[in-house]
Amino acid sequence: MHQENYTEKAIRTIGVPSAVSRMFGFNSPQSVFNWIKNNKVPAERVIQLCELGGWVVSPHQLRPDLYPNQTDGLPKQ
């Protein structure tokens, strides 16, 4: 069974990896490409990535190990 790459979906929602890399202040897009390859965003980047993507992908989808409930990490309404 194929697991959806939510990391790639979150990044593509924002734009291309190089643009996302610049938004995070990285000198190179390599870190962002590694996130996609491993389908894992560093814990300290999850909320910002979701926010930049307009919450199309949730923290729970990106890191269910850190955000076990579907609404964890989402902004309060």
Residue ranges and their predicted role:
Residues 4, 8-9, 14, 18, ...:
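Short, charged recognition helix plus adjacent turn
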Residues 23-27, 54:
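A short, basic/aromatic helix-end/turn motif that makes direct DNA contacts
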Residues 26-40:
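Recognition helix of helix-turn-helix/homeodomain-like DNA-binding domains
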